[in-house]
Amino acid sequence: MITMDTIRKALVCFSILSILVLACGCVNTPEKIDININSNTNNGENTEKPINQENQNVNNVENKKESQSTQNIQSYENKEIKNQENHPLQSNQNYEQTNGNFNEENENAMTNVGESEVNYNNEPAYNYYIEITYPDGTIPDKIEEQMLYYIKVIDPIVGGLAGIDIYVDGNYIGTLDDVYGIVECVFYEPGYHTITAEDNGKILASKTVYVEEGTAYNSGESENYDEYDNNYESNDLQQTQTQFSEIEVYVDDIKPSNSIIITKLAMNPGFLASINGISPDIGVNIEMENGEKINLKYVSMDVDLIIDNPNSESITIDKIILNMFDDEGHSLGRGEVSNIVITPGENPVTVKVNIPINKMGYEILRKLSGEEVFAEISGSAYIEGSGEVPFSGEADLLPPLPTPPFPLPPLPPFPTE
């Protein structure tokens, strides 16, 4: 039998159950609201990624940047090592990282302060330098003119180099040999001189030195001493200078290169007087015995020299330069020869001098008038490693001439040109 008390208890239980159901509904509702708040729509499309996916993307980006940075650093290090291996003379490069790319910046040119050595090509990575020594290997405390020195190029890592071209004041003087790695050098003038070492046109090192006036060399004894009164020149250098100083040059004879032309001119003294004012650029026309007509601007004279080499080895003369004057002091011409090998003993050498036709006409008229006509020669032989060997002498300018069939005209003045 259902009593009121039973009904009351049932209502209480139902109320409690309803409250529990409502409580459960309130707990789930905020999750839906939270999703709606984080899900904005734009034209019906979702523009925001879920929170978990966004966090994952952030982590991926950071990992990617870190990986890319590590990769770029390794790439830079590998590139730096590769550059140094492939180019030992190439200067170090500074790289600036921007978005994975590298911009190269050349380093400043290498300069060794206090040694006046500069690499003008921003190369090399090593400090090459130029060294000047005496032939015995000692380093002089000063550089003097007319002295023999050896030039070397030194690599601090491997030592002396070979095959490097050496220039002094822009003039090529030689290439470092493969045996000793040296080039002989003589400074002929005092003052500042710049030595450069080049490899295939690239300047490896440069050195500027001051060359002092040389001390006169006397009887094979050096007059250069160090602070302890010791002679610092080697015996080899003294012997070399002594040998070169003993080389002598003599004027042996002067003769026409073509004696027929001289005879032809001597037979026409009036003609010789008439050409006194003619410029040698125009010349004169002469008909030879065989009917050949030539335009004569100069008359060539051969100056025969004797060069005495008392040494046991041959010596190469770089060049011989001489000037010819007549006995009245008039300049007649200049001659030059180069690259002459002088063997031990006496060596005949001929230097040709071209005398303008109007000046030669004057000298022939003097000779026909009975005067003694001499040529005075002054010149120098330039020998590598020893400097200048001066010489002088005189000889008859003309051979005996035939008496012309015509009276001699008055002697004109010496042509100005």
UniProtKB/Swiss-Prot annotation:
Acetylation recorded as keyword: no
Subcellular location: Cell membrane
TM stretches of this protein: 10-30, 148-168
Keywords (A to Z) from UniProt: Cell membrane, Membrane, Transmembrane, Transmembrane helix
GO cellular-component term (any): plasma membrane
Annotated Polar residues bias: 86-106
Disordered: annotated segments: 84-106
Gene3D superfamilies, per database record: 2.60.40.1820
Membrane-related topology note: Multi-pass membrane protein
Identification of the protein by name: Uncharacterized protein MJ0943
Organism this protein belongs to: Methanocaldococcus jannaschii (strain ATCC 43067 / DSM 2661 / JAL-1 / JCM 10045 / NBRC 100440) (Methanococcus jannaschii)
